[in-house]
């Protein structure tokens, strides 16, 4: 039992665990993978100290946000988008300071250009690494954030697969997660203040793909394949 339970050890989950532990919460993160996982790159914020160091002007969000919202027929949560715009700079600067303290280079990706959006996205690399393309150094960042989360007192457990959410019958709030360990036994993680699901999309879930996007099931090759929770980002596609 802890204040916060985080499910998933990607960049989102690791950063959540680190931030909560930094603020004094008791945190347990568990993941189906056997290590922190990065399957992408292109870390975006509305502005940040690295962009400022390069002398790039602050993004005017109007055209960019309008284009992105229109692409989704304006069915998105616009309040959430604006929260991202208003708070992403603070969050990214926090992350940049941490990974730099762990000897990770922070740079702007060379292959990220949008017609009516920002010409920058944050990438990461090992010291001396001159590669600045999307995703190539993301593992450096997630491992640095994992180290910081542990330093702040977070507990991280791997090879543990979430199986069922437990909801409060009166409020409907998710209060716990039942998971299966590598030895086949089950464990219940109770979060008194919150449960954070940071497990990514359902591109590796055969049942959900079959229901919501059956036409791609043969293409992604999941018909008879076992899920590999440790698979990293594939440059040829997921």
Which residue ranges define each predicted feature?
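N-terminal Rossmann-like FAD-binding beta1-loop-alpha1 element of flavoenzymes
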Residues: 2-28
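Glycine-rich loop(s) and the adjacent beta-strand/alpha-helix scaffold that form part
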Residues: 182-185, 189-238
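Conserved redox-cofactor binding core of oxidoreductases
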Residues: 84-186, 206-207
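Generic hydrophobic/aromatic pocket-lining and core-packing "Φ" positions
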Residues: 14-17, 92, 235
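Short acidic, glycine/serine/threonine-rich loops at helix termini
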Residues: 38-42, 170-172, 201, 206-210
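Conserved N-terminal glycine-rich FAD pyrophosphate-binding loop of Rossmann-like flavoproteins
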Residues: 33-57
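Fold-independent oxyanion-binding glycine-rich loops
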Residues: 9, 31-33, 159-161, 179-182, ...
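Dinucleotide-binding Rossmann-like beta1-alpha1 core, especially the glycine-rich loop
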Residues: 51-55, 63-99
């Amino acid at each position: 039992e802890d204040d916060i339970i985080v499910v998933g050890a990607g960049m989102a989950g690791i950063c959540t665990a680190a931030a909560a532990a930094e603020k004094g919460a008791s945190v347990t993160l568990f993941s189906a993978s056997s290590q922190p996982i990065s399957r992408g790159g292109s870390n975006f914020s509305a502005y940040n100290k690295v962009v400022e160091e390069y002398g790039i002007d602050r993004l005017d969000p109007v055209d960019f946000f309008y284009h992105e919202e229109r692409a989704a027929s304006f069915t998105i949560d616009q309040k959430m988008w604006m929260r991202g715009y208003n708070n992403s700079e603070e969050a990214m600067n926090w992350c940049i300071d941490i990974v730099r303290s762990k000897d990770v280079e922070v740079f702007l990706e060379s292959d990220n250009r949008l017609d009516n959006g920002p010409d920058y996205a944050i990438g990461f690399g090992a010291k001396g690494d001159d590669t600045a393309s999307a995703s190539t150094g993301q593992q450096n960042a997630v491992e640095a954030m994992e180290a910081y989360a542990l330093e702040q007192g977070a507990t991280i457990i791997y090879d543990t697969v979430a199986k069922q959410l437990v909801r409060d019958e009166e409020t409907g709030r998710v209060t716990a997660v039942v998971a299966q360990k590598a030895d086949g036994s089950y464990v219940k993680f109770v979060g008194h203040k919150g449960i954070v699901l940071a497990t990514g999309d359902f591109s590796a879930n055969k049942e959900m793909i079959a229901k919501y996007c059956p036409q791609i099931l043969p293409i992604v090759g999941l018909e008879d394949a076992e899920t590999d929770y440790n698979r990293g980002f594939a440059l040829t596609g997921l």
